[in-house]
């Protein structure tokens, strides 16, 4: 799909090209109970009051998400006009904008339009510039057009005909909007990779498959890839990671991807993604109902791979390292048992009270490994706890950090990227729940504050650098009839890196 940018100040009569240019449809926003303004006012004038008459008749009341097509409109070059309700102007925020653009894309994708002129990016949204609106609109469109059909015997062809979108933006934002197009396409491509990896079944997306995916990313985008096998992992003394992997016939992999966009001496940001390609719970076996969704337990790994791919496509001036410990968590005659004690790469001993709390066991060794890069920051991403889903549901990812400045950056990025996160507590008092009579610490701390104690466990391995943890158990995928990976938190992570790179 092709996206292009044209500067236009509708209030200064600069819209002639939009009014006369050939297009299958021009998209206009209508506020509830407000006089027309901007693009809608100009089109109304060119069509001799058609938009005003439609609004006055009540066919378009401006309620948020409502859409109405006008056909064979005279006075303009477009063959259709799509009116989109924006809701009340004083309540028009980022969510309202996203609702409006999503409604517009859904209406357009149900038609046979090929080329569209899109004016909604110029709407005033929480003091955001129109380049922000362009990026959000492209991501919303790519979200609507994403389909996972790779595993079907006859992959379904695209059901829409849309090929080209021309965005009108404020002239002062034209240059930035062109950058926003590049960023949005790269982000969408990274999210699609993340979704594809999550949606693949566990018998296809194995640890070896993830390793091969990392190698392909490296080859396609000029990155350096290291994929360590069992013997190399053993040599690193990653006893905690290996305690999870030991009962599976699928060999574990330890993936390291290096992106160098800045000077070699510049400290990298390290992203660590949990890569459990299928989680049965091990000896602490999960219930059978819904276990198929445990193929999504590698979505942390998928999001890290999708993010570094997006960073490479954007060409950000920053160094990034992606680390993915990946294996299956299976029962078996040689599986780790509740009560077993294992030794982590850091040397701390861990009493494994529950083998279904395995994500933290593979992440802790990866977090220790990250020390060798002397990182500017480390962010781990994991579908870690059901407790986080209970606490936050499916809207906000859980954010934990021992560094207020880093947490603030990530929260700012989450708002900018429309990828919500909520900071959770990490007080020292919660650490007491991880005490063990027999080892340095236990891998669970009981039912109370389960997401917090999981983050507390990880914090024991992150003392030498600024660190944050994203628990995406509620946001990485949707269940039920809408089952599928979401691609989150690629937008949040990518925006954080864009901000760090000053781009």
From Swiss-Prot:
Assigned EC number: 3.4.11.1, 3.4.11.10
Protease found in the keyword field: yes
Superkingdom of the organism of origin: Bacteria
Annotated positions binding Mn(2+) 2: 274, 279, 297, 358
Pfam families: Peptidase_M17, Peptidase_M17_N
PROSITE patterns xrefs: CYTOSOL_AP (PS00631)
Cellular component GO terms held in the UniProt record: cytoplasm
Co-factor(s): Mn(2+)
Cofactor mode of binding and number, as noted: Binds 2 manganese ions per subunit.
Catalytic reaction list: Release of an N-terminal amino acid, Xaa-|-Yaa-, in which Xaa is preferably Leu, but may be other amino acids including Pro although not Arg or Lys, and Yaa may be Pro. Amino acid amides and methyl esters are also readily hydrolyzed, but rates on arylamides are exceedingly low; Release of an N-terminal amino acid, preferentially leucine, but not glutamic or aspartic acids
Keyword Protein transport appears in the UniProt entry: no
Keywords in alphabetical order: Aminopeptidase, Cytoplasm, Hydrolase, Manganese, Metal-binding, Protease
Alphabetical GO biological process terms: proteolysis
Binding site for Mn(2+) 1: 279, 356, 358
Active-site feature positions: 286, 360
GO MF entries: manganese ion binding; metalloaminopeptidase activity
Compartment list: Cytoplasm
Matches recorded under NCBIfam families: PRK00913.1-2 (NF002073), PRK00913.1-4 (NF002074), PRK00913.2-4 (NF002077), PRK00913.3-5 (NF002083)
PANTHER family assigned: CYTOSOL AMINOPEPTIDASE, LEUCINE AMINOPEPTIDASE-RELATED
Protein name in the entry: Probable cytosol aminopeptidase
Taxonomic source organism: Burkholderia cenocepacia (strain ATCC BAA-245 / DSM 16553 / LMG 16656 / NCTC 13227 / J2315 / CF5610) (Burkholderia cepacia (strain J2315))
Source organism phylogeny: Bacteria, Pseudomonadati, Pseudomonadota, Betaproteobacteria, Burkholderiales
Gene: pepA
